[in-house]
């Protein structure tokens, strides 16, 4: 058992965020954490990685277990390049290598010093555990998988875009290989190819993975369990996201039936009390019913999901059918051509997806369409 939560609660002032949370994490688990915005997912993650203490109950961690947490926001040393940043994942092994060199020199002068040989053994254990003599191979594998080609490895972290920095933080965390890997929306800023690589990597991960994500396809591919945060507590479901849906529906039906039965029982008890409390012959029986009513706990009905809002705006003039017209649109950055001689018309009612690997110009195209960047050739006109 890596983590065990027992009747855990967490509040901020008078605002209760989590209550009666009981759950466990074992090595090999891949747990998807889902719930509406504001239900306490990030708060739970901070408790799980030890950054925040519970106000009630207990969070117990396996002795010596390491935890790595990828937040949605984070920082890198802006002066270190991409490759140097990745080498930081091996810092314990790099320190052990430096110490090992010193110890070997000491041992050469004092062959029978068991204290030195013990330290050498400890250093080698750290190096072997991280497979540090193959660190360059590992670094290159993860960088390539996370869409950092070799020509980016010498770039300073400070000049990377926000999305690239997030990918680099994730790449470094994967190399650190903590026992408990906690990821908050890891698929943000990933293209489809990188997502496929990450899914494969996580499915083979030897530790436990806990991930907050709104991407049901990612949850289906990676997760073996689902934690649903609803009503300030966790309900655990076996299987991936698709397996969770019918389980939750069945659980909600059971809860609703129990809630309705409890409400009906309470109403009958109250009705009996109202009719019989003032009658001398039935007062004792009515008082007994009152005690039953006081002890009766009404099962909480399942919380309905928030309904999607639909807006419809009236207009006096019928809008154009052709909303965006592109003719010979060309986009270049420096000597690199991102788009060349595109002819395309976006019609009213179209719903488009712009897909492509990172760095192919998706965001740049949107900036051109929005008028924030001038095209290198051709034209864009709004209808």
Briefly describe each language-model feature range:
Residues 1-259, 307-383:
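ABC ATP-binding cassette signature C-motif
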């Amino acid at each position: 058992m890596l983590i065990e939560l027992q009747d855990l609660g967490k509040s901020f002032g008078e605002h209760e965020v989590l209550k009666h949370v009981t759950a466990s994490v074992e090595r090999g688990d891949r747990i998807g954490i889902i719930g509406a915005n504001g239900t306490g997912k990030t708060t739970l993650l901070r408790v799980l990685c030890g950054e925040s203490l519970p106000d009630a109950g207990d969070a117990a961690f396996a002795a010596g277990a390491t935890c790595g947490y990828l937040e949605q926001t984070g920082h890198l040393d802006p002066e270190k390049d991409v490759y140097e940043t990745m080498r930081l994942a091996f810092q314990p092994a790099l320190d052990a290598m430096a110490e090992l060199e010193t110890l070997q020199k000491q041992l050469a002068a004092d062959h029978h010093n068991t204290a030195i040989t013990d330290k050498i053994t400890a250093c080698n254990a750290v190096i072997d555990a991280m497979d540090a003599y193959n660190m360059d191979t590992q670094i290159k594998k993860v960088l390539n998988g996370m869409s950092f080609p070799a020509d980016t490895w010498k770039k300073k972290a400070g000049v990377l875009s926000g999305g690239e920095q997030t990918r680099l933080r994730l790449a470094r965390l994967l190399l650190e290989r903590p026992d408990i890997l906690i990821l908050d929306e890891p698929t943000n800023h990933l293209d489809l190819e990188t997502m496929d690589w990450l899914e494969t990597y996580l499915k083979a991960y030897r530790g436990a993975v806990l991930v907050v994500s709104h991407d049901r396809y990612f949850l289906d591919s990676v997760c073996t369990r689902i934690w649903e945060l609803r009503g300030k507590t966790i309900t655990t479901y076996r299987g991936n996201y698709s397996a969770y849906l019918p389980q939750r529906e069945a659980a909600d039906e059971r809860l609703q039936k129990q809630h309705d039965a409890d409400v009906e029982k309470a109403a009958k008890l109250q009705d009996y009390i109202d009719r019989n409390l003032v009658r001398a012959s039935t007062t004792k029986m009515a008082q007994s019913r009152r005690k039953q009513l006081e002890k009766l706990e009404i099962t909480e009905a399942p919380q309905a999901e928030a309904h999607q809002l639909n807006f419809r705006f009236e207009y006096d003039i019928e809008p154009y059918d052709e909303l965006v017209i592109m003719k010979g649109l060309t986009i270049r950055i420096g000597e690199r051509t991102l788009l060349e001689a595109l002819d395309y018309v976006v019609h009213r009612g179209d719903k488009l997806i712009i897909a492509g690997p990172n760095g192919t110009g998706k965001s740049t195209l949107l900036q051109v369409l929005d008028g924030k960047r001038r095209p290198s050739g051709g034209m864009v006109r709004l209808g």
